[in-house]
Amino acid sequence: MKKLLILILTTLFFNSFCYADKNMKIGSKGNLNEVSRTIKVKMYDNYYEPSSFSIEAGETIKFEVENVGMLVHEFNIANKMMHIKHQPEMSKMAENGILLAFSIDKEKMKKMAKMDKSMGHSHSNSVLLEPKQKGEIIWKFINAVNIEIACNVPGHYQAGMIAKVNIN
C-alpha cells in the first residue's frame, strides 16, 4: 500500500511538472472587443521597435506588426522556455525549404502542415512575416509572467532579436 501511494504521488508530481510547460503563464488569445489599446511594432533585421513593452496585468493588446527588415521575421509572445522549445520547429521549417531567408514557401507550408500541424505556424501567440508584410495579434495578458517577445527564425533569437515585456 505504501509503495502504491508513493507511485501515485510521484506520478502526480511529474505529471503536474510536465504539464506546466503546456500551461505556462503567458496569457491567451484576446478578443477584438476587449482591446484596450493598439501597439504598432516594426521588425527590423534582428531587433524590434519598440524594444520593450509595458503592459498592465489583464490588459488585452492589439499588436499591429510590420516587417520592415530584409529578412523573414517572427513576432512571438512566450517565455524563454517556450521560445527554446519552438526553435526546433522553426529549424525544421528551414530544413524543409518552407522558411527561407527572404520568403516563406506557403504551398510547402500547407503540405507539411497536413503531416505535421506545427509546420503550419498557426499559433495564436505568433505571426511570421516576410519582408514588407504586416500582421496582427490580439493578446490578453492574464496571468502572464516572465514574457518576452522574440523571433525564433534560426539564428535570430541567438542574435538578440528579443523584446522585454514588463507586466505591471
Question: Each PLM stretch: what is its role?
Answer:
Residues V65-G69:
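Asparagine-centered strand-capping/turn motif at beta-strand->loop junctions
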Residues E74-A78:
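Beta-strand signatures of extracellular beta-sandwich domains
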Residues D21-S28, M43, Y47, M70-L71, ...:
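Extracellular/periplasmic metallocenter environments
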Residues P88-M112:
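Extracellular/luminal beta-rich ligand-recognition
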Residues N15-A20:
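Sec/Tat signal peptide C-region and signal peptidase I cleavage site
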Residues L4-F13:
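Sec-dependent N-terminal signal peptides
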Residues K29-I61:
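N-terminal edge beta-strand
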Residues N79-K85, N166-N168:
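Short edge-strand/loop segments of extracellular domains
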